[in-house]
Amino acid sequence: MLSSPTVILQPYGLPVYPQTASCYPGIVQGAAAQEAGPGNGDPSLPQVYAPPPSYPPPGQAPPTPAARLPPLDFSAAHPNSEYADHHQLRVYQGPQHDGTESITASNTDDSLAPVTSDPQSLSVSVASGSGAAGGSDEEGGGKAQPKRLHVSNIPFRFRDPDLRQMFGQFGKILDVEIIFNERGSKGFGFVTFESAVEADRAREKLNGTIVEGRKIEVNNATARVVTKKPQTPLVNAAGWKINPVMGAMYAPELYTVASFPYPVPTPTLAYRGSGLRGRGRAVYNTIRSAAAAATPAAVPAYPGVVYQEGLYGAEVYGGYPATYRVAQSASAAATATYSDGYGRVYATATDPYHHSVGPTTTYGVGTMASLYRGGYNRFTPY
């Protein structure tokens, strides 16, 4: 007999406190009624381990504890309490079906849905009803919506009353319009019906008919897409040269126009049209005219463009007297020592850098080539 209670763990992990046989002779595990293990001759000693439970082999479902749990069926409640041992188990029962009462109760939630036994007939009836409703809406919209027809290739003598009389037999016409220009009718027009159905009927009847030897065409009028044309920018003949900054560098001849709106720099105004030529670059004119900037003078100009380049003027051809050249100021003419073009290198004075070349009227191509081959070059470094 044990002197103190001993805690024994079963395979399920629940502690079991063994008691002596004198206290609970019929409840203690491992009593004399059970199988005695080896060395279990004393009936007062408890059975230490219970027999291991049996597990199903792999791949099979575990057996249902039919002997311990009641069947879970949706049957009526058990008023007699057959399962007294399982008083904590709640048995759920399904709803009671009593014929027409359940149908009436279910229809209270959806009272608008038709009650039919055939779902196919239900879908057909609903579809036919919606189709009828859609057709009525479409028909009503067609009657209320006006429609415009485009009539082309009509006789040129036709006027609005003639076109109204031709289409008025098919329905009420809201508007008739024939397009005209300064020479008369353009041969087409528009007819607006109050109803789209009447417009379609008129289009089917009159399209392709012969009226006074002309086959008219009647079609549905479509909205014209109106596109706004871009505004043409204000440019002159020179295009991009209208900018005063760009024109001063690349097109100084624009500043010789008397009506040009932009202000003209003082050196350019003083030596406009003078003999100080420099391939049309404003930088040369500014440098060469710096000495006479203090005494500017007005420059008479022709009504047209006074050319800055000698290649553009009449002096490019050579042999013309000075009276036929571009008008220039007195101050500019006094200091003019360079040629108007490439044909005459020196016109009024000698070159201070080369004393062997004297004043001359013009040089030919051969003479110019010989001068350059002979060492004449103002920009030579030595």
Swiss-Prot record:
Signal peptide bounds: none
One biological process term in Gene Ontology: heart process
Location(s), subcellular: Nucleus
Molecular function in Gene Ontology: mRNA binding; RNA binding
Region of interest: Disordered: 34-79, 94-148
PANTHER family listed in its UniProt record: ATAXIN 2-BINDING PROTEIN 1-RELATED, RNA BINDING PROTEIN FOX-1 HOMOLOG 1-LIKE
Purpose: RNA-binding protein that regulates alternative splicing events by binding to 5'-GCAUG-3' elements. Regulates alternative splicing of tissue-specific exons.
Listed name of the protein: RNA binding protein fox-1 homolog 1-like
Taxonomic source organism: Danio rerio (Zebrafish)
